[in-house]
C-alpha cells in the first residue's frame, strides 16, 4: 500500500509519461506536482526523493544509470522512469480517484 505522497508522486510521473517524458528528474517531477496539486502543500525535494526511493524499491519506478557525458556542471541529477508495473498502478490510482479530467493531465 502506498502512502499519499507516494501516490501523488506516481500520478505526477504518469502525467509526465503521458506527454512524452519517458525519463524525469526531481525538479521536473516537483514542477508537475505543483501543477497538479495546487491546493495541497508543496512537497520538499527530500520528501520527493524518499518517495522515489520507496517507489523504486517496490518496482514502480526505475532509476536510470547516469550518463557521464550528459551533464558537466553542478550536482548529478538522478533520472527515473516508470516501470510497466508503475504505469499500471498509476493508471489504477487515477481511475480510482476519478482523475480523468483535462486538469489532471495538465502540464505547466
Give the ranges of each region predicted by the language model:
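Beta-hairpin "wing" of winged helix-turn-helix
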Residues: 58-74
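Short alpha-helical segments that sit at the start of domains
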Residues: 1-24
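DNA-recognition alpha helix
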Residues: 25-39
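Short coil/loop residues immediately preceding or within conserved phosphate-binding loops
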Residues: 77
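Accessory beta->alpha helical hairpin/"wing" motif in late/C-terminal subdomains of nucleic-acid enzymes
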Residues: 66-68, 80-87
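Basic amphipathic alpha-helical segments that dock to polyanions
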Residues: 48-58
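Amphipathic alpha-helical dimerization/coiled-coil segments
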Residues: 85-108
Amino acid at each position: 500500500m502506498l502512502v499519499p505522497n507516494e501516490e501523488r508522486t506516481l500520478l505526477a510521473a504518469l502525467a509526465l509519461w503521458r506527454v512524452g517524458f519517458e525519463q524525469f528528474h526531481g525538479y521536473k517531477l516537483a514542477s508537475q506536482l505543483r501543477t497538479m496539486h495546487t491546493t495541497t502543500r508543496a512537497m520538499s525535494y527530500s520528501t520527493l526523493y524518499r518517495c522515489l526511493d520507496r517507489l523504486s524499491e517496490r518496482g514502480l519506478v526505475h532509476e536510470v544509470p547516469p550518463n557521464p557525458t550528459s551533464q558537466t556542471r553542478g550536482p548529478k541529477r538522478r533520472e527515473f522512469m516508470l516501470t510497466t508495473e508503475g504505469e499500471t498502478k498509476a493508471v489504477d490510482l487515477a481511475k480510482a480517484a476519478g482523475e480523468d479530467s483535462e486538469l489532471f493531465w495538465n502540464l505547466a
